[in-house]
Amino acid sequence: EVTDELRRLLKEFETELAILRGRVDGLEARVGELEATQFSTTTKLKGSTHWVLGAAKYHGKGSSQQAAANGGTSFSYDLRLALETSFTGKDSLVTRLRSGNMDNIYGGNGVGLFGQEYGVNTDNAVVIDRLFYSFPVGDEFTIVGGPRVRMDNMLPVWPSAYPSDMTMDFFTYAGAPGAYNLALGAGAGVYWQTEGGFSVSTSYLSGNGNLSDPNTGGIGTDGAAFSATTQIAYAPESWGIAAAYTKASGTNGTGLYSGNGTVGAVALSLSDGQTNSYGLSAWWTPEESGWIPSVSTGWGLTDISDSNARYVSSATTQSWYVGLEWSDVFLEGNSFGVAVGQPTFITEIDVKGGKNESDYLKGGGYAWEFFYKFQVTDNITVT
């Protein structure tokens, strides 16, 4: 029953009610338009691209030859498109497409250590870069696996606060390219992670898991190019520590990438032997931006055994790095970073054929970088 008082109120606020009805109708129309044009109700599309313009200047022995082969200015790109699908709200099916044309210094041509994290070359073809599925088991366990999964996709914690999307490739391996080799292939892993920040993970993958010939590929075969990793980490909100162990086979391709070590260390890791790698990492991030940077550091050691290299039976290599990043430098969203370290170098070696060990222990140099990232818009940065 509409009382006189209610009629009076309706008449008094008639204009406001009409405005509200119009706004509701407008919102319903917009929601309908979004539902009609949205990509998917279960899938998110994420994309990123790097455009790189630059050149390198060479110094030292062999610089004239390097300049003649890779001394020009280049302009190239890296493109990534990721489709993330969830069927239950807790699981995730990741399909990532990638394309690039960095057949230049940024892809590791000439001096491998100058290779960048984004330095991929697919000759402009679009390839399936990732294809894996993860789902929870209970409240604390997660299983991850797929035909194109990378080692770090199966880790609950990445042991570094230093950015990995704009830097030299070496500085994206937490100082231990042997333990965190970022091997890619067919595999699976499981991890346990508590709300308090403690986690344990283990995984196995085959770099040639798509092949059925056990001599050149397969899973669990001599030709599998396998990589098995176990990590223990404790990572509360603003800091963390981690220890990792990886056993890998250099057979058919699993080993250090050229941007992660000296020529000798990379060659030995790719020989038909076994590697046992260890990594220790720690990182800390300040609660507020300011003069104090985030600090990340890591150290790695790799034992190489049963090598089929012509003059080497076994060897030991080491590596380390320290990375600092300041947030909101000059303007909110901008950042400045600097990193220094030693890419993987040989520290001990067992040679044969009358060779001199000292000839193989040379060349353990240093790598360093600094960057300033300017946030032009929410989605565009210039570094």
Predicted features by range, described:
Residues T42, S48, G54, A68-G209, ...:
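Outer membrane beta-barrel
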Residues H59, I105-N109, L155-P159, P163, ...:
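Outer-membrane beta-barrel and related beta-rich outer-membrane complex signature
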Residues D139-E140, S160-T285, I292-I304:
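Signature for the C-terminal beta-barrel architecture of outer-membrane proteins
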Residues E33-L34, A67-N70, L81-L83, L131, ...:
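Generic recognition of flexible, low-complexity loop/linker segments
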Residues Y245-D272, S281-W283, S294-T383:
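Outer membrane beta-barrel transmembrane domains
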Residues E1-Q66:
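N-terminal periplasmic/intermembrane-space "pro-region" immediately following the signal or transit peptide
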Residues K61-A69, Q116-G119, Y173-A176, P214-G218, ...:
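Extracellular loop and loop/strand-boundary signature of outer-membrane beta-barrel proteins
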Residues T73-Y77, A125-D129, L182-A186, A224-A228, ...:
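Residues that define the transmembrane beta-barrel architecture of outer-membrane proteins
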